[in-house]
Amino acid sequence: MTAAAPTDVCIIISAKNAADTIARAVASALAEPEAAEVVVIDDGSTDDSASVARAADDGTGRLNVVRFEENRGPAAARNHAIAISHSPLIGVLDADDFFFPGRLGQLLSQDGWDFIADNIAFIDAAQAATAHGRIDRFAPTPRLIDLVGFVEGNISRRGVRRGEIGFLKPLMRRAFLDQHGLRYNETLRLGEDYDLYARALANGARYKIIHSCGYAAVVRGNSLSGSHRTIDLKRLYEADRAILAGSRLSSDAEAAVRRHERHIRDRYELRHFLDLKNQQGFGRAFGYALTHPAALPAIIGGILADKTERFRPSGSPAPVALGGKGDVRYLLETLAVDQPQK
């Protein structure tokens, strides 16, 4: 085996029933000269995801497709890909999504990081073929984000855009992950990225963000990443509690993680109440609320907020699948400092 160069990147793609999009994702990763490995994990698909991924091979010997017989979740799929790869840098690409040309080179032009991420463009599936020509060009404007800023950037607030910093798709240094024993938490089916990045920051990771846009996130109404179970919320706030119990955090960082834990726990309490109402009737749900008074503010506040949210006008451009009119939306839009190229 040829020794890996310091800038060699392994791109990991976890796929579940992604036959319609996986070829585009694989092709965009293989088009990046810095991608020394592209590892696709077919996570128990019932369609032809694995064979479609193999058909996208460019013959350079960089593509490795592995199929799980049963679905194990994206965290397990990514951990397996990390275990069977060797490149010193690791990046994740969702099977619905794709890279814009030159993404990895732009990221690797920066120094002084353990994790580095760029802007994300949210687009509708119908825009994918022409999206690169429509993307605004932003100056990189690099900055480091600490644990407090990262966690606060994952807390949604009514009337403003939902917290999305955890959606960023950073390159990660394998050496840092190995040094601190960091891997994805396989009990999580929601927020596994947030949890890994938060634990890395708690261990002193230098997480750099640049504002140039190299990642296209294709938004679909039936996307697996857009749905979750009530139990997934419970496991996510329990992951926050594990960070609090297992890390020596500053007072500001501890307070931020506690706010995120409470935010996710409130979402869980509301969802659990609604599940009981739908499955066992209002009486059972009302009884739960009465016997769990600590959950009452989350339940009452959540119901009232949901009823008023439908009357709130959209305040920013968005793809159709996100309730907009087909516009491109940027995760780091408010930090844009450059004008679109005409």
Curated annotation (Swiss-Prot):
Annotated transmembrane regions: none
Family listed: Belongs to the glycosyltransferase 2 family.
Protein name: Succinoglycan biosynthesis protein ExoU
Classification of source organism: Bacteria, Pseudomonadati, Pseudomonadota, Alphaproteobacteria, Hyphomicrobiales
Gene name tied to this protein: exoU
Predominant cellular place of this UniProt entry's protein: cytoplasm
Annotated GO biological process: polysaccharide biosynthetic process
Annotated pathway: Glycan metabolism; exopolysaccharide biosynthesis
Keywords noted in UniProt: Cytoplasm, Exopolysaccharide synthesis, Glycosyltransferase, Plasmid, Transferase
